UniProtKB/Swiss-Prot annotation:
Stored HAMAP family: Ribosomal_bL36
PROSITE patterns for the chain: RIBOSOMAL_L36
Entry keyword Cell wall biogenesis/degradation: no
GO cellular component, one term: ribonucleoprotein complex
Subcellular location: Plastid, Chloroplast
Listed name of the protein: Large ribosomal subunit protein bL36c
Length: 38
């Protein structure tokens, strides 16, 4: 899980979601692409 000021999709399988007011990226194809804004 990477924590970044700005999160963006890395590949076409990444999905931008919002959990408890936090923007996150989850990726089913490559778990290394997981990101959280903060």
């Amino acid at each position: 899980m990477k924590v970044r000021a700005s999160v963006r999709k890395i590949c076409e399988n990444c999905r931008l979601i919002k959990r408890r007011g936090t923007v996150m990226v989850i990726c089913s194809n490559n778990p290394k692409h997981k990101q959280r804004q903060g």
